[in-house]
Curated annotation (Swiss-Prot):
One of its GO terms (molecular function) is 4-hydroxy-3-methylbut-2-enyl-diphosphate synthase activity (flavodoxin). The lineage of its organism: Bacteria, Bacillati, Bacillota, Clostridia, Eubacteriales. PANTHER family: 4-HYDROXY-3-METHYLBUT-2-EN-1-YL DIPHOSPHATE SYNTHASE, 4-HYDROXY-3-METHYLBUT-2-EN-1-YL DIPHOSPHATE SYNTHASE (FERREDOXIN), CHLOROPLASTIC. This is 4-hydroxy-3-methylbut-2-en-1-yl diphosphate synthase (flavodoxin). One of its GO terms (biological process) is terpenoid biosynthetic process. Its EC number is 1.17.7.3. It comes from Clostridium perfringens (strain 13 / Type A).
Amino acid sequence: MNRKETRKVKVGNIYVGGDFRVSIQSMTNTDTKDVESTVKQIKELQEAGCDIVRCAVLDMDAACAIKDIVAKINIPLVADIHFDYRLALKAIENGVSAIRINPGNIGSREKVEAVVKACKEKNIPIRIGVNSGSLSKELLTKYGKPTPDALVESALEHVKILEELDFHDIVISMKSSNVETMIESYRIASQKTNYPLHLGVTEAGTPWRGTIKSAIGIGTLLAEGIGDTIRVSLTGDPVEEIKVGKEILKNFGYVKEGIEFISCPTCGRTQIDLINIAKEVEERLSSCKKNIKVAVMGCVVNGPGEAREADIGIAGGKGEGLIFRKGEIIKKVKEEDLVEELIKIIETI
């Protein structure tokens, strides 16, 4: 996959942009002032494969809590700031690796200058995060609604503010809950700037709908070589965002570790409880780091042949199944033992 080369920006120990890998981000949904709960969730996200995590900084108590949170984690933390520049200054002082702001909504130029000065001193980048729901009245009047051109113009207006202050450690996002708007916004921005782009469909929805929208939006852009870091936004446990994000990247070859799982849709030839077997295999292997393809197929007639590219898999028969490797049958097993035998063999690979 050929990606457009962008500027590289360092976020903690992670580089975003350049020729560095596409990273995965998420955001905590805890009360940031609750240090224990926030740290617990951050560690869960990191264990799931998150590279960079963001938390909301709503008030000074939350900004002060950043210090204790940073001391207990080893993953880059981004502070999400709106309106009050003092929250950004306190979060920077307390050790965040980056901040997300829109320079145009935190007040006078002097306030923006104070934030930029603090970021420069700590070598901290700024993500300009434009959303379709937060465009200025002027842009909405000009374009009539949150169009791709409106989102890009908003982002570049904020970029200009930072560039005028000789600040260039910038990441840009232009998110919309409308997938077509989101895709076109990033296409336009990719042509107009070489700052790294943070991809995401905002307010994508519950895991089912949100996964589909995010896969289409993020996936389309990645296929075109656009995007340096991603965040899948889902209503629910943010760990699910990481799982979906990893699968999107895996299907484009950006993530090499972890199981690639394939299974057939079942048909009239299926004579085992394939649906539950597939669910169990996928769940049992969810934390496996091995870079192998595993197939769960419904029948012995076509299973091994159809899954010939799989490293290992099972094909169901009547109350039994075959375990195969690279399309070659290696073992016949009773249905109730299929999953256990498959897992045992995978552990030896």
